[in-house]
């Protein structure tokens, strides 16, 4: 009985450890990267952070999402592979926020609805537009061989 229990436990542990997603070919080592997003010290939760390589195309999704503390851990995603960290290199950084529209904005029969939606979004946006635009963002991050951190105070861009 003990032998069976040992082998069953060994098999379960091996299955969990040995079944990790393998990195895609050509993926360089990943470096730990954290981004803190706040508005004059007040953490901003649920802010998406995206990283665009300044040279070439990564071929992978590079992003993160802030928690209640305003901190996002950068992740590299390629197919079913998903791991914390970014490959070394230089990146432009953009932010995005999800704003829930109330049900009354779901009336597509109203010809003025698109304009009303845009007005609502503009009134409820907390991020400066420049930080959301990949072509205009002033936010940059260089990831070297050691852990990288970026502190973004959005109040500086309002």
Regions found by a protein language model. Give the residues of each.
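Short, ordered beta-strand-loop transition motifs
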Residues: 5, 144-145
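Beta-strand-dominated extracellular/periplasmic modules and repeats
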Residues: 20-141, 148-158
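Bacterial N-terminal signal peptides that target proteins for export
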Residues: 1-8
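C-terminal motif of bacterial Sec signal peptides marking the signal peptidase cleavage site
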Residues: 15-18
């Amino acid at each position: 009985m003990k032998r069976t229990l040992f082998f069953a436990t060994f098999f379960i542990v091996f299955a969990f450890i040995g079944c990790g997603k393998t990195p895609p070919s050509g993926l360089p080592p990943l470096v730990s990267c954290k981004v803190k997003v706040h508005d004059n010290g007040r953490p901003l939760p649920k802010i998406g952070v995206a990283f665009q390589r300044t040279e070439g195309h990564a071929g992978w999704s590079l992003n993160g999402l802030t928690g209640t503390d305003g901190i996002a851990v950068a992740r590299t995603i390629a197919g079913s592979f998903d791991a914390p960290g970014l490959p070394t290199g230089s990146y432009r950084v953009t932010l995005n926020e999800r704003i829930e529209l109330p049900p009354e904005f779901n009336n597509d029969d109203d010809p003025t609805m698109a304009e009303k939606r845009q007005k609502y979004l503009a009134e409820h946006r907390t991020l400066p537009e420049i930080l959301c635009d990949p072509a205009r963002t002033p936010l940059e991050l260089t990831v070297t061989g050691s852990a990288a951190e970026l502190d973004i105070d959005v109040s500086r861009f309002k």
